[in-house]
Amino acid sequence: MITEPSLTGISGMVNRNRLSGLPDQPSSHSFTPVTLYDGFNYNLSSDHINTVVAAPENSVFIREEEEEEDPADDFDFSDAVLGYISQMLNEEDMDDKVCMLQESLDLEAAERSLYEAIGKKYPPSPERNLAFAERNSENLDRVVPGNYTGGDCIGFGNGGIKPLSSGFTLDFRNPQSCSSILSVPQSNGLITIYGDGIDESSKNNRENHQSVWLFRREIEEANRFNPEENELIVNFREENCVSKARKNSSRDEICVEEERSSKLPAVFGEDILRSDVVDKILVHVPGGESMKEFNALRDVLKKGVEKKKASDAQGGKRRARGRGRGRGRGGGGGQNGKKEVVDLRSLLIHCAQAVAADDRRCAGQLLKQIRLHSTPFGDGNQRLAHCFANGLEARLAGTGSQIYKGIVSKPRSAAAVLKAHQLFLACCPFRKLSYFITNKTIRDLVGNSQRVHVIDFGILYGFQWPTLIHRFSMYGSPKVRITGIEFPQPGFRPAQRVEETGQRLAAYAKLFGVPFEYKAIAKKWDAIQLEDLDIDRDEITVVNCLYRAENLHDESVKVESCRDTVLNLIGKINPDLFVFGIVNGAYNAPFFVTRFREALFHFSSIFDMLETIVPREDEERMFLEMEVFGREALNVIACEGWERVERPETYKQWHVRAMRSGLVQVPFDPSIMKTSLHKVHTFYHKDFVIDQDNRWLLQGWKGRTVMALSVWKPESKA
């Protein structure tokens, strides 16, 4: 969970972001390099690339119309969700939005840090949730030193507060600049600090340094709540308040209210589906334009795979001829061309053991050796070693929590996250297979019923539901009610993103003529009560939770495990069906070396899968490796306690938890399993593994289980 060579696109490839016939979109996203604390960089900056994921050599490309099966099954398993993602990418402000999951997981961390800075106990009181701009002058005076009257001005960079030369202008859009007049937003105006620096004749330097530290912490934490990439822009000229922009106790109340409204501008709803793209949104209906484009893309991928295979064969012949010439010369001329072979996994494990033993000298030497042979632009092992070395270095320096907070506080474009998710769907069957099985199981359960209520824990962007809505329109249109549950977002609109997901889904339901109702819940999952869900016993009730339960804390953090609390709530809901998908991992152990080893094995499978299927130059692959999986690895390695939010367990551990909650596991429909296996073996790499164990559907890569899916019912309905 980072001097970069120039990267070139693969000529002749089509842009996968144009799969659904929508208007042209930017084909790449940029990464802003940020250097954090120890000097190494966790972010990428690359040229614009237009690439398509290269299918593996063993993939088979078969048209849907050649199979004697229900074409609707092909629709469900095809990239139906890509049309939904493409529509989201066409929304005007998607590039400016930050990732929903990123914000929700860090809100609690931000609250805790603010309370630690002022010496109060968490959890916060309601008034504490206000942004930094709403603090009163008394609280601000306790944070800002009162004797800023001396020499240099202060700049706020990634490394903390730094003295800068005079003459710069401090702008919150550019935190590393500074001026001799420092203005900080406050509830009744701007409090202004005049002078050229800090008075060295302070009577109490210790108190002064503490105030500086507190001020730095408050600025860093407050920036997380500022809209649009931490920019806080207050336009007093438009509000006719220029003359009152300084601290003034006699300013007008009207001007106060106008200034407050300008600090955090209200976000007004927009048309989720604009008129120029409504006609082009097709959810990959068999025979439709989107399916034709999908088949054309498969043809292009097939040609690319054949070309790559031929190129690899020619390269092997050249290497064989080179070895033959070397032997003919007696082997003396080939020594300089040999590359040093390094077992990066062993080095990483030995380094983790040294870090756990606090052997800094040995750990430093091993880290230096790992850095020498790892790179974010090499093969899969080198990229994996680079990510894990970042985590080890942060843990060794004792700055893991600060570095992780610094990374997650940097906004990630929601468009970039969607494009990366689009790539993951294209190259890996895990989530697509889960969507297909879940939707097919729900449809079979609903049958001819007139009403269905889906409660989705961790709905995020609602990727899986457009296909279900479309299928309901094909085989009867029951009233669909979806309750989308997400963690709250920071700011004054904690439910904004989950509400936007509902608006998109409502637009799809209207497009296909399906009666639809949506309710958004933005709360901590363990704080949700049964009354919040509006259960109607006359409806078919389905609870869905796919691959998000790992972010709930367990008994090692909280005596009353959040995981058991949520499962007990699901038992009280008494659903007709509970679909449960988990990330299968054993790296939730309290002992660091054990956790590190298991995390290394888990992420090795993912990085090897990407190395086998996706070209190294692909931008979205780099984003997945560094910004998604690399960030998760950093959290697992460098963070402890409540700050460690990546806590997956094995499917056997989750099985025990679910049974303790009064749930009974039921088998999958054999016909669904048969269709799923056929699809995976037909359209995906041969090294993807689909298996069953104790009624769990196991999905993995080269024999290692990565994800698991199961279906449960209450004891009363089993």
From Swiss-Prot:
It comes from the Eukaryota. A motif (VHIID) lies at residues 452-456. It is found in: Nucleus. Keywords: Nucleus, Transcription, Transcription regulation. Residues 421-484 are annotated as: VHIID. Residues 335-713 form the GRAS domain. The keyword Kinase does not apply. Expressed in cotyledons, leaves and flowers, and in the elongation zone in root. Residues 500-532 are annotated as: Leucine repeat II (LRII). The keyword Cytoplasm does not apply. GO terms for molecular function: DNA-binding transcription factor activity. Residues 305-338 are annotated as: Disordered. Residues 638-713 are annotated as: SAW. GO terms for biological process: regulation of DNA-templated transcription. Residues 316-328 have a biased composition (Basic residues). Probable transcription factor involved in plant development. PANTHER family: OSJNBA0084A10.13 PROTEIN-RELATED. This is Scarecrow-like protein 9. It comes from Arabidopsis thaliana (Mouse-ear cress).
